[in-house]
Amino acid sequence: MDLKFNNSRKYVSISVPSKTQAMSPHIKSVEDVVVLGVNLSKFSKLTQFLICVAGVFVFYLIYGYLQELIFSVEGFKPYGWYLTLVQFAFYSVFGLIELQLTQDRRRRIPGKTYMLIAFLTVGTMGLSNTSLGYLNYPTQVIFKCCKLIPVMLGGVFIQGKRYNLADVSAAVCMSLGLIWFTLADSTIAPNFNLTGVMLISLALCADAVIGNVQEKAMKLHNASNSEMVLYSYSIGFVYILLGLSCTSGLGPAVAFCSKNPVGTYGYAFLFSLTGYFGISFVLALIKIFGALLAVTVTTGRKAMTVVLSFLFFAKPFTFQYIWSGLLVVLGIFLNVYSKNMDKIRLPSVYNMIKKAMDMKKSRTLAQTV
């Protein structure tokens, strides 16, 4: 605020900074959406949507392909935690580079909060990567689609929440779809192991918590995405490094990867890079068009990932995968619908019956004439 005094006329001029000027230095504009150095705000809404969708599909499809490709390397399956260690190292470097490109490099979120977020991030990504040593990739993706289940269970038992019929129906559809998909996998998959189901279930529980903690911390302290990535993944890197050192899991993993550096470290670099770029487009999609459209796009991406997994990697197939997957998709739709009932208006059963009766009457009248 600037104060200007004029002795001759004796008045005070007060100028209030604009909203853009009053913002934190690391945010250029309220409306600007910058992804990978490109300001999407200069384009039309349709172009922004197409760019974001293309980014999500391209980077995350490559991400999923590389993740399954790494675990298809003979002998790599026991080293899921080491892959997570390497992934956290790359994410920390990417976050540091992005943070250096901003004007404001101060850490805004307290260290204790980052220690909690890092622990949850380790649980989410480490357990998810390790589960691929026991599960088919499509089964893991289907489980990832069902984060609503642990979120609802936590809301009921911890916060005493009550959910509407659409939410309950969504959870039931997801649960039945998961059970059906898992039973199909256990019947035809030669390497099925319940350990993988337990690992991915624990990863889902951590993932259900981490989103709320991250959102609350970033809003409370006005932190940037690059700061969140740098500190949460660098602290998580230390956690995993200590864990692998204490369990003697670091030496064998390093020895194995040194024999095939291109198939391990090379793929891990591309895997981490595409994942880092992919999340940038998802965040841009949420900021411009909202969570409803973002969920729709990411769900389509996951469905495409499952299809490509069956095309590029040889694995047994049964039509139970299709029916159970459709149940999960129905659950996702019901979950999105329950949160956006004012935007999505479905016709009631009464209106549908009335419309059908009117059409029948019109056909009868036409036949009579």
Swiss-Prot record:
Its main location: Golgi. One of its GO terms (molecular function) is antiporter activity. Keywords: Antiport, Glycoprotein, Golgi apparatus, Membrane, Transmembrane, Transmembrane helix, Transport. It is a multi-pass membrane protein. It catalyses: 3'-phosphoadenylyl sulfate(in) + adenosine 3',5'-bisphosphate(out) = 3'-phosphoadenylyl sulfate(out) + adenosine 3',5'-bisphosphate(in). The chain crosses the membrane at residues 46-66, 79-99, 115-135, 138-158, 168-188, 191-211, 235-255, 266-285, 292-314, 317-337. Glycans are attached at residues 39, 222. GO terms for cellular component: Golgi membrane; mitochondrion; trans-Golgi network. GO terms for biological process: 5'-adenylyl sulfate transmembrane transport. The keyword Cell wall biogenesis/degradation does not apply. It is found in: Golgi apparatus membrane. InterPro entries: SCL35B1-4/HUT1. Pfam families: UAA. Belongs to the nucleotide-sugar transporter family. SLC35B subfamily. Probably functions as a 3'-phosphoadenylyl sulfate:adenosine 3',5'-bisphosphate antiporter at the Golgi membranes. Mediates the transport from the cytosol into the lumen of the Golgi of 3'-phosphoadenylyl sulfate/adenosine 3'-phospho 5'-phosphosulfate (PAPS), a universal sulfuryl donor for sulfation events that take place in that compartment. This is Adenosine 3'-phospho 5'-phosphosulfate transporter 2.
